[in-house]
Amino acid sequence: GVIFFGLMLTENGPKVLEYNARFGDPEAQVVLPRLENDIVDVFEACIDGTLDQIDLKFDNDRATVCVILASDGYPVSYEKGFVIDGLEKFRDKEDYYVFHSGTKFNGQGQIVTNGGRVLGVTANGATVKEARENAYKAVEEISFANKYYRTDIARAVDEA
């Protein structure tokens, strides 16, 4: 199973905000790209009750960082329907993943924003620092009106 803890670092140490018996988002977006098993085999084993017979393997030689691209104003109030450009740059790019969340196709077949959390831009690297650099470079390749993202993801690694 999976247990997910939502934590916040405070002056008095970490505080638990929530916990769930499922993957969180974007937590799954940094774990699943490192899964070496075929995900279909894993899901079928879950369905068949044979997950204990699967030797789950993960790529532990690389680090992964995910930066969420959101609509400015999220979570309170934001506009939708802005065309997203740059996604084609990641179609065959190894070690980069763009996970859709708040997107849809408009009437012209373009991918547009359709929610507060729009995309999860995930990148691998040899170290957390390199994965962070790669993720933020990838974030710059994607554009849409009212794009917002945090600039402090994995920053503690740079400051260490």
Outline where the language-model segments fall.
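Active-site "cap" helix and flanking loop/linker of ATP-utilizing ligase/carboxylase catalytic domains
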Residues: 1-3, 20-93, 106
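A short glycine-rich, hydrophobically flanked beta-strand micro-motif that places a catalytic Asp/Glu
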Residues: 1-9, 151
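Protein kinase-like catalytic core scaffold
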Residues: 3, 15-17, 117
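Conserved phosphate/anionic-ligand binding catalytic regions in large, soluble enzymes, centered on
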Residues: 9-25
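A structural signal for short secondary-structure junctions
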Residues: 9-11, 58-61, 91-93, 111-117
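Hydrophobic alpha-helical segments of multi-pass membrane transport proteins
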Residues: 92-102
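Generic C-terminus detector
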Residues: 103-108, 112-160
